[in-house]
Amino acid sequence: LVGSEMCIRDRIYDQALYRVYIEKGKFDYLYDKVGLYDKLRGVLCHQVSAAQLTYCWQSVDGIGGKMLNFLENHDEQRFASDQFAGDADKVLPALVVSSMMNTGPMMIYFGQELGERAEDAEGFSGKDGRTTIFDYWSVTTVRQWYDSGRCSVSKLSAKQKKLRNLYKTVLNISRLESAIVRGDFFDLMYVNGENPSFNPHRQYAFLRKYGNELLVIVVNFDDRQANVKINIPDHAFETMKIVSGKYEALELIGGDKEMKELSPEIPFACALSGYGAAVWKIELKNFSKEIQKK
């Protein structure tokens, strides 16, 4: 409850009932546990192909803005726990997809941005990769950040500080970029399934666009570096009103700038580190101005 407004959210295990709960139950948001969360976990644990992430947005098409995405909560095992990814540094591709695939909110569970591993054997809960909800307990990483009420990073390790800054960067992109907050979405996987310069089982790519701002988003769930070349079909150029040409592009996570070619004939080239991601922002109006000058 915030002021006079109440936000109602819940988790439903049957996706067929999502629309009923939203339309008739008047729920503001639903946790997409059995959709996006389960698929992302499956990809990270090498149980599911990244290509299956396409089904996640398709199954909630039209209500994607009502999905509350997450990578951790009170019931699930911590991302960095041995029972899940085993290392908080593997989070970037999943975090980017979860926070940028649709217009809905992203939830961060306490201590997630610090790489909490839930290694304690807490009372009733035991050592199960979760932070107990049954016992009075003090979570080490959160206690370090709380720092006796100072709420500072002074007691965090270098790795924790780096991870926290990464979360800050990605979440601010998803919060501030109009293409993500209210823009259109275009999945690129259907034209890259047999692409020799793209592994659809370990990489995922999509577009977001609002006005003249285009984001080319690609993630790598593999531990090896990948130099990918992504096919962008004619249909994307037509439906999103993209003009082919060379553009100056800014990579929003790392800050790199490059000239990128947008064309249905020439694949979009992108270098990705292991468990990396890239969010290339292109101002389409720049190209139009160049044409006008000529």
Model-derived regions, located:
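Short, flexible loop/turn elements at secondary-structure junctions
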Residues: 12-14, 72-75, 137, 210, ...
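A generic structural motif
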Residues: 9-13, 241-253
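Solvent-exposed beta-strand/loop surfaces of large extracellular or lumenal domains
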Residues: 246-267
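Short, surface-exposed recognition loops and adjoining beta-strand edges that mediate ligand/DNA contacts
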Residues: 9-16, 189, 193
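C-terminal beta-strand-rich structural cap/linker in extracellular carbohydrate-active enzymes
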Residues: 260-294
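Glycan-processing catalytic domains of CAZymes
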Residues: 11-12, 16-65
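Short, small-residue-biased leader/transition segments that mark boundaries at the very start
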Residues: 1-8
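Loop/helix patches that line or flank the sugar-binding groove of alpha-linked glycan CAZymes
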Residues: 38, 42, 51-54, 61-73, ...
